[in-house]
Amino acid sequence: MNLHDLQNISENFQSTQRMPVLFLGHGSPMNAIEENQFVQGFRKAATEIPKPNAILCISAHWYTPGTFVTAMKMPKTIHDFYGFPKELFDVQYPAPGNPELAREAAELLLPAEVEEDHNWGLDHGAWSVIKHMYPEADIPVIQLSIDYTKPPQYHYDLAKKLHRLREKGILIIGSGNIVHNLRLIDWKNINTVGAGWDWAAEAREKTNNWLVDGNFQPIIDYQKQGTSLQYAVPTPDHYLPLMYTLGLKDQSEELALFNDELIGGSLSMTSVRIG
């Protein structure tokens, strides 16, 4: 692709006011079909920002060796879970894709190598939250995978290259959970909002303080921040989408938290809006 081709792609998205960026704590797949305070928070977030021209989602559930971007015209709805009710498997979110946006994102991320993908689709980290925000499924959605061979700092820096998409009305969403330790779930309080082990509460408080203070380096270097963060992030898959949201923040922009609750002992639903 040459610069002329990229210019033609870019012209498909009219310049508009800078779109905010979100990190959404997606929690259980059941949030896709339940009515609770968290899905209400997702809906409210959508009402507080301009309607996007398209959505680029970085989901915890597309965790790959290397970086890929969905480039099909009609991504399938992926039910990447098991042991849930049939009602959840019946959910379809038929949003269109956007191959042109996929190519532009890949071009912006150079010299990182980003391969176009035509097999993945929309996993539940994407559709389970976006369906509440935009139930009409009339906004194109693409996904960018997370390269699990790279450290948090790499993902934070990579995100900065996507900044110009914000100026074109593209909503960039990181979808995961800051505190996410499925092995230590408190099954007696699996649906109890506010239920959290002491270490989970400490990890949430630490990260919240760093977030609101704009002090992102300790968040990036979470492995150096003590026992509570080690328990909160036993594997980085659900944590790394936050790096993309934070990497897109301008110094002067405001950051706000919402859905800021622990649930089930070892999960946080804390979500972030920038801009």
Where are these regions (language model features)?
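Flexible, glycine/proline-enriched loop segments at strand-loop-helix junctions
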Residues: L88-P96, S145-P152, L229
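Internal, conserved structured core segments that host functional sites
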Residues: A102-Y156, K161
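Beta-strand elements within well-structured catalytic alpha/beta cores of enzymes
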Residues: P20-L24, A54-S59, L144, L165-I178, ...
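A short aromatic-anchored loop/beta-hairpin motif
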Residues: N2-A112
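Secondary-structure boundary elements
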Residues: T47-N53, L108-V114, P151, H163-I173, ...
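Surface-exposed, charge/polar-rich loops and edge strands
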Residues: I139-P140, K150, D157, H163-L171, ...
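Short glycine-enriched loops at secondary-structure junctions
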Residues: A60-T64, M74-P75, L122-I130, I178
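Short, basic/glycine-rich phosphate-binding loops at helix/coil junctions
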Residues: L22-F23, D80-P85, Y134-I142, I220
